[in-house]
């Protein structure tokens, strides 16, 4: 049965529609975890620490893709809901071209700033050298990474979430296969890990670009773009919450790494790296669900179908509550096994990782509501509220927690910081839902 964003959704149809986006994000997190697994177990703890130290800095430059993807897809989906298909294609083309240009400029800027960024996180010696080398290697494919993130959002808007999944799987299999080839067979070490990621991102960015350039069966087509400064500004402001979320997550990760080096040494950074790999896998479910439902919300808002908007909102809260309970329980119980996969070769590091992950696991209980809340308001084209939620949960609350809690609890305070921040953000999100329900008619 064909399902697109204009359909009426029961739970079965909703799950079927968002499943490709959820699986896609899980798969992305899986091959990201594969990078960590190969580097940690076959290149060494120093390289693993370096990768985790510099990766947040790389993501600062890549975040423009999330902004253009989420903000642009919301605007295009709303335009489609209003029945203006030709305008939707022109906007889509302008957004893709702008994202590519931004990725190229940021790649060049990042190359020159990389040594300063690594040094600012208190890296020194071999860790510093490895961080700069790995960071500059990954910047070679930054424009393609940006495009990949943009197309992930637009595949859903175009009514082709399953195609986005297939392209992601192709990209992921490429990365895992090349990791094994370059690291295990060719013995290229950190260079091999970086090149595997670069080639994977080129595959993930070029294939959807070619698809939309050719005649296709989706709802969208790349055409000659027409400059529309106001629409581009709307895309950037509407997607600013996702930009803020991802930039802030990167800067907060840098702050975590700085605190951990000061309190627990390089083992703390390595343990935090393991926790982040696994957390991304768990949070990928929330990200994929939010990404999958956002075009549905935007379409129904644009088409003024309040009854369907209310239905999607209520169903989503139920799904997120059940998922949060399941993920929190699973994370707590599986912590020893997950730590052993990445750092089983070092008993002290594994013990530190298990303790940290069990404190961290409580954040999954409420994190889904915060993520969905931000994405929901973006889909309603209210970038301001979405940005406030993102800024508070990802920056303000976490910075306060990671600075204050270690003063009383030491390293445990660092592990608890995310959970405390998500609890505070949950109350903010619920407050906005209650305050805006009459304006948008979703409750």
Where are these regions (language model features)?
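Helix-terminus/linker motif at the lipid-water interface of multi-pass membrane proteins
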Residues: 30-49, 118-125, 181-188, 250-281, ...
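Short runs within selected transmembrane alpha-helices of multi-pass transporters and secretion channels
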Residues: 69, 137-156, 167-175, 193-206, ...
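Alpha-helical transmembrane segments and their lipid-water interface positions
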Residues: 28, 32-39, 62-69, 73, ...
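N-terminal transmembrane alpha-helices
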Residues: 6-43, 56-71, 75, 100-107, ...
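Transmembrane alpha-helix boundary and packing residues in multipass membrane permease domains
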Residues: 21, 25, 37, 41, ...
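Small-residue-rich hydrophobic transmembrane alpha-helices
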Residues: 48-108, 145-164, 271-335, 367-389
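Transmembrane helical elements of multi-pass membrane transporters/channels
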Residues: 16-35, 137, 171, 200-204, ...
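Short alpha-helical transmembrane segments in multi-pass integral membrane proteins
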Residues: 1-18, 76-141, 185-240, 297-363, ...
């Amino acid at each position: 049965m064909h399902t697109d964003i204009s359909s009426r959704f029961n739970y079965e149809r909703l799950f079927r529609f968002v499943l490709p986006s959820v699986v896609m994000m899980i798969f992305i997190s899986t091959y990201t975890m594969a990078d960590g697994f190969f580097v940690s177990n076959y290149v060494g703890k120093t390289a693993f620490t370096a990768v985790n130290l510099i990766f947040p800095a790389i993501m600062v430059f890549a975040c423009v893709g999330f902004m253009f993807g989420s903000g642009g897809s919301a605007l295009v989906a709303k335009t489609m809901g209003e029945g203006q298909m030709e305008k939707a294609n022109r906007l889509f083309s302008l957004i893709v071209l702008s994202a590519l240009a931004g990725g190229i400029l940021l790649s060049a800027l990042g190359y020159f700033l990389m040594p300063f960024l690594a040094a600012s996180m208190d890296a020194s010696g071999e860790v510093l050298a490895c961080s700069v080398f790995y960071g500059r290697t990954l910047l070679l494919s930054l424009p393609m990474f940006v495009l990949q993130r943009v197309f992930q959002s637009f595949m859903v808007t175009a009514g082709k979430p399953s195609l986005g999944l297939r392209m992601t799987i192709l990209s992921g299999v490429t990365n895992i296969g090349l990791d094994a080839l370059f690291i295990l067979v060719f013995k290229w070490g950190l260079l091999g890990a970086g090149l595997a990621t670069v080639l994977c991102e080129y595959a993930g960015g070029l294939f959807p670009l070619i698809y939309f350039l050719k005649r296709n069966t989706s709802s969208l087509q790349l055409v000659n773009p027409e400059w529309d400064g106001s629409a581009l500004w709307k895309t950037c402001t509407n997607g600013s919450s996702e930009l803020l979320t991802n930039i802030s997550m990167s800067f907060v990760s840098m702050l975590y790494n700085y605190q951990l080096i000061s309190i627990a040494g390089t083992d703390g950074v390595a343990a935090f790296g393991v926790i982040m790999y696994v957390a991304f896998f768990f949070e990928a479910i929330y990200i994929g669900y939010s990404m999958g439902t956002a075009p549905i919300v935007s379409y129904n808002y644009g088409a003024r179908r309040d009854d369907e908007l209310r239905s999607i909102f209520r169903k989503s809260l139920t799904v997120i509550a059940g998922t949060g309970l399941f993920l929190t329980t699973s994370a707590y119980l599986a912590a020893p096994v997950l730590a052993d996969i990445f750092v089983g070769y070092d008993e002290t590091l594994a013990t530190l990782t298990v303790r940290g992950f069990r404190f961290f696991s409580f954040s999954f209980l409420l994190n889904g509501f915060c993520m969905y809340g931000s994405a929901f308001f973006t889909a309603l084209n209210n970038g301001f509220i979405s940005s406030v939620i993102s800024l508070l949960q990802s920056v303000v609350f976490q910075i306060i927690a990671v600075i204050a809690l270690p003063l009383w609890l030491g390293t445990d305070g660092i592990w608890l910081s995310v959970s405390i921040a998500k609890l505070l953000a949950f109350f903010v999100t619920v407050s906005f839902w209650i305050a805006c329900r009459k304006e948008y008619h979703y409750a």
